[in-house]
Curated annotation (Swiss-Prot):
Keyword Hydrolase: no
Cross-referenced InterPro entries: SCL35B1-4/HUT1 (IPR013657)
Residue intervals passing through the bilayer: 57-77, 107-127, 144-164, 173-193, 197-217, 234-254, 293-313, 337-357, 380-400
Example of a GO MF term: UDP-galactose transmembrane transporter activity
UniProt topology in membrane: Multi-pass membrane protein
Gene symbol of the encoding locus: hut1
Protein name: UDP-galactose transporter homolog 1
GO biological process: UDP-galactose transmembrane transport; UDP-glucose transmembrane transport into endoplasmic reticulum
Family to which this protein belongs: Belongs to the nucleotide-sugar transporter family. SLC35B subfamily.
Length: 424
C-alpha cells in the first residue's frame, strides 16, 4: 500500500451507508450552455480516466485475502493466548505434573494491541495523504476530544470483561456472541439517541439472540456445569460468563454508537475519517491503559486504593504489569503469540480501511460475515473442538440473521442507487 492519492476521506458510517466516496476530480456541472460541447468532451475523458483507475479483480482479491489472512490468524492467536495453559515450571521427578497457568493479563494485551494499531494507523494516514498536503490531525477540534476519550475508555474497559468471560465459557461461544454487536448497538441507539429501526432489524436481533442461546444451552460443558452448580446450590459459571460477555458487548455498543455519532455530526466535530479515528482511539487507549498499569502498583502499596474502594482488588490486578512480564519471561512462546496477535490485528484494520477506500461497505459486510464464520470453523478444526447438532443450529440462526440483514441492506442500497439514477 504505497503512498497514493486518497479518493476521499474514509468515513465510518452506518452499515447501510456507502463508504467509497467519489474523487474530487470527477466532472463538474457546467451551467453555461455555450460550453456544453467542451463539457461533454471533458466528461468522456474523465469517465475513461475513472474506468482506468477503477479497482479491478486482482485488487479485490488482494483486499479480501488480506482481511481473511489477518483476522483468521488474529483469531487463532487470540484463542491460543487466552485458553491454552502452560506449566509453571518444567516437570521434575518430585512433581511430574506441575501446576498450570494461563495468560490472564487483559490490560497488558490491550495496551500492546492499541500501541501497534496506533503506529500502523498513523503510517496508513500518512501514506494515504496526497503529496504536498498536510496529514490530517487526529484531534481537529476541541469538541471532538470528549467523544474520543469516551470511545477510548469504553473500548479499553470492554476487553477485560470479554477476556474474563473466557474463564467461564468456551472460545466458540465467545466468538459467536461477539458476532451479535447489532443488539447492544440498537439498544443504545433506542435509549440514548431515540432512533427508530425498520421491522426486519428486530427480526435479525431475535434470530441472533435465539442462536446464541441455542448454542450455549447445547454446549456439552454447559449442562455439566449447570448440574454441578445445582448440587452445590450455586449459580452456573456459564451464566456468569454470559453476564461478563454481555457487559463487554454493551461497552462495544457504546464505542460503536459514539463513533457513529462523531462521523454523522460533521457540523459539530468537522469531517473525521476512519484512519483518524483509528489513530486517535488507539493513542488515547494506550495512554489510559499504560497509566493504569504504571500507577496501580503505587496506589496499592500506599493503601490509598484500598481506603477509597469498598471492594478489595485482587493482588494480580494491582501488579498486572509485573506479573505479565514474569509470565512472558517464563513462557517466551506466548510473547511471540502476543506480538503476532497485535500485529495481525493492526494489519487487519489497515486492510479494512483500504478496502473501504476502494470498494463499498456492502462488500465489507459480506467479507466480515464470512470471515467470522471461517474463524469459528478454523477454531473447530485447529483446536479439535466438536459441535453438537444443537450448536450447529445456533450457528445457523446467528449467521442466517446476519446474512439476511446484509441481503436486505444490499437491496435497499440498489433501490436507492436506482432512484438516484432516475432523478439525474
Amino acid at each position: 500500500m504505497a503512498r497514493q492519492k486518497q479518493a476521499a476521506p474514509i468515513q465510518r458510517a452506518t452499515s447501510s451507508e456507502l463508504m467509497h466516496m467519489l474523487p474530487d476530480d470527477l466532472p463538474q456541472k457546467h451551467h453555461n450552455g455555450a460550453n456544453m460541447g467542451l463539457a461533454n468532451k471533458d466528461t468522456t475523458r474523465d469517465k475513461v480516466h475513472e474506468a482506468a483507475d477503477a479497482p479491478g479483480l486482482w485488487q479485490l482479491a488482494f483486499c479480501v485475502a488480506g482481511i481473511y489472512a489477518s483476522f483468521l490468524s488474529w483469531g487463532v492467536l487470540q484463542e491460543a493466548i487466552t485458553t491454552v495453559s502452560y506449566p509453571v515450571h518444567p516437570p521434575t521427578a518430585a512433581e511430574p505434573e506441575p501446576e498450570k497457568e494461563r495468560f490472564t493479563f487483559s490490560i497488558v494485551l490491550n495496551t500492546i494491541q492499541s500501541t501497534f494499531a496506533a503506529v500502523t494507523g498513523f503510517l496508513y494516514l500518512y501514506f494515504s495523504t496526497p503529496k504536498g498536503e498536510k496529514v490530517p490531525s487526529i484531534f481537529p477540534t476541541r469538541k471532538i476530544i470528549f467523544p474520543l476519550v469516551l470511545v477510548s475508555i469504553s473500548s479499553s474497559l470492554a476487553s477485560p470483561f470479554g477476556y474474563a468471560s473466557l474463564a467461564h465459557i468456551d472460545y466458540l461461544t465467545f466468538i459467536l456472541a461477539k458476532s451479535c454487536k447489532l443488539l447492544p448497538v440498537m439498544f443504545l441507539h433506542l435509549t440514548i439517541f431515540r432512533k427508530r429501526y425498520p421491522l426486519y432489524k428486530y427480526g435479525v436481533v431475535l434470530l441472533v439472540t435465539l442462536g446464541v442461546a441455542t448454542f450455549t444451552l447445547h454446549h456439552p460443558g454447559t449442562s455439566n456445569k449447570v448440574a454441578a452448580s445445582a448440587t452445590k446450590g450455586t449459580s452456573g459459571s456459564s451464566a456468569w460468563g454470559i453476564f461478563l460477555l454481555s457487559i463487554n458487548l454493551l461497552l462495544d455498543g457504546l464505542t460503536n454508537t459514539t463513533q457513529d455519532h462523531v462521523f454523522s455530526s460533521p457540523q459539530l466535530y468537522t469531517r473525521f475519517s476512519g484512519p483518524q479515528m483509528m489513530v486517535a482511539q488507539n493513542v488515547l487507549s494506550t495512554l489510559l491503559t499504560s497509566a493504569y498499569l504504571l500507577i496501580m502498583p503505587h496506589l496499592s502499596s500506599t493503601g490509598i486504593l484500598h481506603a477509597i474502594l469498598p471492594v478489595p482488588i485482587p493482588p494480580s490486578t494491582e501488579t498486572e504489569l509485573t506479573a505479565a512480564v514474569s509470565f512472558l519471561s517464563r513462557h517466551p512462546e506466548v510473547l511471540k503469540s502476543v506480538l503476532g496477535f497485535a500485529a495481525f490485528g493492526a494489519m487487519g484494520q489497515l486492510f479494512i480501511f483500504y478496502t473501504l477506500s476502494q470498494f463499498s461497505s456492502l462488500l465489507l459486510v459480506t467479507v466480515t460475515v464470512t470471515r467470522k464464520m471461517l474463524t469459528m470453523l478454523l477454531s473447530v478444526f485447529w483446536f479439535g473442538h466438536s459441535l453438537s447438532a444443537g450448536q450447529w443450529l445456533g450457528i445457523g440462526l446467528v449467521f442466517g440473521g446476519i446474512g439476511a440483514e446484509a441481503v436486505v441492506q444490499r437491496q435497499e442500497k440498489k433501490a436507492k442507487a436506482a432512484k438516484a439514477k432516475k432523478t439525474e
